[in-house]
Design a protein with these regions (language model features):
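A short, N-terminal "cap"/entry segment at the start of jelly-roll beta-barrel domains
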Residues: 1-52, 139-144
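Double-stranded beta-helix
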Residues: 2-7, 112-144
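A short, acidic/glycine-rich surface segment
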Residues: 35-36, 58-64
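Short, charged/polar surface micro-motifs in flexible loops or helix N-caps
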Residues: 44-46, 54-59, 81, 130-131
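Surface loops and adjacent helix of pleckstrin homology
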Residues: 51, 87-89, 114, 124
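A short beta-strand-loop-beta hairpin characteristic of the jelly-roll/cupin
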Residues: 61-64, 68-97
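Conserved metal-binding segment of the jelly-roll/cupin
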Residues: 95-114, 126
Length: 144
């Protein structure tokens, strides 16, 4: 599958965003793994999603879907047990529901759901993809 940018929902006024009416964006390919993304807002100021992984599944990276961004990330675990690992350095953290992890731009990361339940993670990315911080930025970095 070829990389294509995710949807960029944006709102000019207070808006009720209903979870049940959201479309799921699928990120990934066979090599990288697949992630479900519920994109709440992604404009020039803010990118906020919930991403999900099936029990005992993971995401890594592939040539098309790289996991290094020109943005800082804050991840808050809603459900499941998340293990995040930097394939470049080997640094690894186990993150439980109610806990968060933060990392700076240019940090490679792989994610693993090591639980029997569906993993959901609240993610904030800054600067947002609309300013060029995600997929196309990742392709400017050396591939590991």
């Amino acid at each position: 599958m070829t990389y294509k940018p995710s949807p960029r929902p944006s709102y000019s006024m207070p808006t009720h965003i209903e979870y049940n009416n959201m479309k799921i964006h699928k990120w990934g390919d066979e090599e990288a793994g697949y992630v479900d993304d519920w994109i709440y807002i992604s404009n020039e100021k803010l990118h906020q999603i919930i991403f999900g992984l099936k029990p005992h599944s993971c995401f890594k990276h592939s040539k098309e879907f790289r996991t290094i961004f020109g943005a800082d990330e804050l991840l808050y675990i809603l459900s499941g047990i998340f293990v995040i690992s930097n394939p470049e350095t080997g640094e690894t953290h186990k993150v439980l529901p109610g806990d968060s992890i933060f990392f700076r731009k240019d940090t490679w990361h792989h994610g693993f759901n090591v639980s029997d339940e569906y993993l959901q993670v609240l993610e904030f990315l800054s600067p947002p993809p609309s300013l060029g911080s995600s997929g196309f930025y990742a392709k400017t970095k050396p591939y590991i």
